[in-house]
Regions:
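Aromatic/basic-lined ligand-recognition segments
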Residues: 130-136, 212, 216
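A surface-exposed partner-binding patch
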Residues: 1-134, 230-232
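Alpha-helix initiation and N-capping motif
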Residues: 13-16, 43, 165-169, 181, ...
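Acidic, metal/cofactor-coordinating or nucleic-acid-engaging core segments within structured domains
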Residues: 119, 133, 178-185, 189-190
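Charge-dense, low-complexity intrinsically disordered regions
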Residues: 185, 191-232
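Broad, structure-driven detector of short, well-ordered beta-strand segments within folded domains
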Residues: 134-145
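Hydrophobic beta-strand residues in large extracellular and virion-surface proteins
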Residues: 127, 139-141, 152
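Compact, glycine/acidic-enriched structural inserts
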Residues: 150-186
């Protein structure tokens, strides 16, 4: 496949590659790691991936999710501000959509404390994690049979699982904006200052909406800033 064909067929994959280049190329960001995982069969086959999700897991994901397809087994970055006084830190580890559904079960690690929570955890599949910092924060899609547009949940071991006010495509688009700043997901959850999960991250999130727009002025951060104000 030519570079042009790759860009046209898998546009979100190209945007992820661009995100890693942005992080590596900025003098005010100290990058600990950026990594594109392998492209492996059969995960590289767009048609077969979504056909098998329907056949084996009854997950007929809709076109907006399919448009965010990327072939890499995982896409990862870990970084921090180059300013030693800064609390701005980021990490993400995105998993291929098929691997997320098949391998990354929240219930493998967290059982839940009651029947409702156990049912929820049994359906959550992790697609974004923080393995390098070990922060215990991750995002998961709810693999309810028959869904075309799965719920997205943020799991923080300090606060449990919180449903997010966005869908899978919007999550992936917002990740590009935030660069994976630790805790950005709280801006789309019913949580705020005083909550055990949000409060320790408030200063870093405040710095995110103040500093990152100056580092990457080509993007619009107005909604993120507004959401943070609502939670402070």
């Amino acid at each position: 496949m030519t570079a042009a064909g790759h860009d046209e067929e898998f546009p979100y994959e190209k945007r992820l590659e661009g995100l890693l280049e942005e992080l590596r190329g900025h003098s005010r960001i100290q990058v600990d790691e950026t990594r594109l995982g392998p492209i492996e069969m059969p995960f590289d086959n767009f048609g077969e991936v979504f056909k098998d999700l329907v056949k084996w897991y009854d997950l007929p994901f809709g076109e907006p999710i399919r448009e965010k397809f990327f072939r890499y087994a995982e896409v990862e970055a870990s970084w921090r501000s180059a300013d030693p006084q800064s609390e701005l830190v980021g990490e993400f580890s995105l998993s291929h959509v098929f691997r997320s559904v098949v391998e990354n079960h929240v219930s493998d690690t967290w059982e839940g404390k009651d029947d409702e929570e156990r049912e929820l955890y049994g359906e959550l599949r992790i697609f974004d994690d923080t393995p390098r910092t070990g922060s215990g924060r991750m995002a998961a899609l709810r693999a309810t049979r028959g869904t075309t547009d799965p719920e997205i949940w943020f799991f923080d071991m300090r606060q449990g699982a919180l449903e997010m006010d966005l869908d899978y495509p919007a999550y992936l688009d917002t990740l590009l904006l935030t660069k994976g700043t630790i805790g950005w997901q709280y801006l789309f959850c019913d949580a705020g200052f005083g909550d055990v999960g949000f409060t320790p991250l408030a200063k870093g999130l405040q710095e995110m909406v103040e500093v990152i727009p100056r580092l990457f002025p080509q993007y619009d951060y107005a909604e993120l800033a507004s959401r943070l104000r609502e939670r402070m």
